[in-house]
Amino acid sequence: NINNVSSGGLCTNINVNDVVVHGIPGQRKLKSGDVVGIDVGIWWKGFHTDTSTTVAVGSPTPSIQKFLDTGKEALNKAILLARPGRRIQDLSISMQRTVETAGYSAVRALTGHGIGRHLHEEPAIPCFVVGAYATSPKLVPGMVLAIEIMYNQGTSDVVYQNADGWTIATTD
């Protein structure tokens, strides 16, 4: 869990199908058609990392491939916009437009973030538009960002799943 990363080490979350983030690895056997997000955080020499990728098990259906391609497109566009002088909202506008144009919903309960000596630092980087553009933080040289595209096929609603108090899944 996240405490392992904060005290030094590695944290891996495995998010299967309706799990958006923080899926706890277990004995579940994956099957063809599953969508699996692998989220890895490492604390090394006083600094944190946070990275993830999402893949399909086996050959994805056309609708699953479109879903995965949309996430990659949204991330790539946001990365291209992440330049000094831009505002966080430039990234948010692009991510929200990309996922919603494809027919998906941007998750509003979770955001990307700055990262460095602490796992979650300012600025928050939502994949949806919030607040006034003029008050959105400006990107400056030296910022390290964890740009996270969190989106659902259904509604944007998420909920803590099970009794673990950690796993967050879609509500539909």
Segments predicted by a language model, with ranges:
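Active-site neighborhoods and metal-handling regions in enzymes and metal-associated proteins
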Residues: 1-172
